[in-house]
Amino acid sequence: MTTRKCNKFRKTSESEISLSLNLDGEGKSNIDTGIGFLNHMLNLMTKHGFLDLDIKAIGDLEVDAHHTVEDIGIVLGKALKEALGNKEKIKRYGTCFLPMDESLAFVSIDISGRAFLVYNCEFTVDKVGDMDTELVEEFLRAFAFNSEITLHTKILYGKNNHHMIEAIFKALGRAIKEAVLIDEKIKGVMSTKGII
């Protein structure tokens, strides 16, 4: 099987990000974004997705975390797209309902080549740890649009905002794991068009 790995580096006036992704990993991560809560969420996503992910990010956190979070989503999305190559034999779709104590999250993805985000998540606080809760949507949008996937996410219910966000990231990891699985029964790509 072709190695499905990608290394990316992106530098702007707002952030500098180096990233290494292995789709066929063991759930190992080495993540330093400068944002403790985001580190925690990406570690969880990596573990549940059986990805190997290294990220070193330096951003303008003296402004706020927006640029750094969004730019990590951009780089991770581009890395996923590149690591998938021609997308032959991948299952394409991945869906996960994931409970975290009192919270339940739903994530479904389609590695379609069509970038789209449906985001139905509401939080009751502005910040969890050192990250604004509104940045969850910014991260997911940047990730979906740069990986060219369709991504639906919804919080069905919950009270603890940490638990709700944690459920999203764990579910995202599991949905990615399912969608990128190789199925030898698939001839070419999982589309009657012959391309995704």
Swiss-Prot record:
Its main location: cytoplasm. Keywords: Amino-acid biosynthesis, Cytoplasm, Histidine biosynthesis, Lyase. SUPFAM superfamilies: Ribosomal protein S5 domain 2-like (SSF54211). It catalyses: D-erythro-1-(imidazol-4-yl)glycerol 3-phosphate = 3-(imidazol-4-yl)-2-oxopropyl phosphate + H2O. The keyword Amino-acid biosynthesis applies. GO terms for cellular component: cytoplasm. InterPro entries: IGPD_sf (IPR038494), ImidazoleglycerolP_deHydtase (IPR000807), ImidazoleglycerP_deHydtase_CS (IPR020565), Ribosomal_Su5_D2-typ_SF (IPR020568). The keyword Cytoplasm applies. It comes from the Bacteria. Its EC number is 4.2.1.19. CDD domains: IGPD. It holds the Pfam family IGPD. GO terms for biological process: L-histidine biosynthetic process. It is found in: Cytoplasm. One of its GO terms (molecular function) is imidazoleglycerol-phosphate dehydratase activity. It is an enzyme of class 4 (lyase). Belongs to the imidazoleglycerol-phosphate dehydratase family. This is Imidazoleglycerol-phosphate dehydratase. It comes from Clostridium novyi (strain NT). The gene is hisB.
